[in-house]
Regions:
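Ubiquitin-like/PB1-type beta-grasp interaction modules and other compact soluble beta-rich domains
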Residues: 1-82
């Protein structure tokens, strides 16, 4: 599974992407984030307020209950605003 980080999320995570192999109990976006936040304090801080983060799986916007599987590409980025 490939994770992509953009904008301030990339800065906080210290990388633009990483490949991970979460346990089989990780079945949707929310359980992936829960697993990620238990890995280290950086992830825990970065994903502490999910209202400031949008998520896409395989380049489609999704909700937290969206199912995921090995081989998926999951992107995390701030909401885009215009003006």
């Amino acid at each position: 599974m490939k994770l992509l980080y953009f904008a301030w999320i990339r800065v906080k995570m210290g990388t633009s992407n990483e490949s991970v192999d979460p346990p089989s109990t990780v079945e949707n976006v929310q359980s992936l984030i829960d697993w990620m936040t238990r890995r280290n304090s950086v992830s825990s801080e970065t994903f502490s307020d999910l209202t400031t983060i949008r998520i896409a799986v395989n380049q489609e916007y999704v909700d937290l209950d969206y199912p995921i599987k090995p081989g998926d590409e999951i992107a995390f980025f701030p909401p885009v605003t215009g003006g």
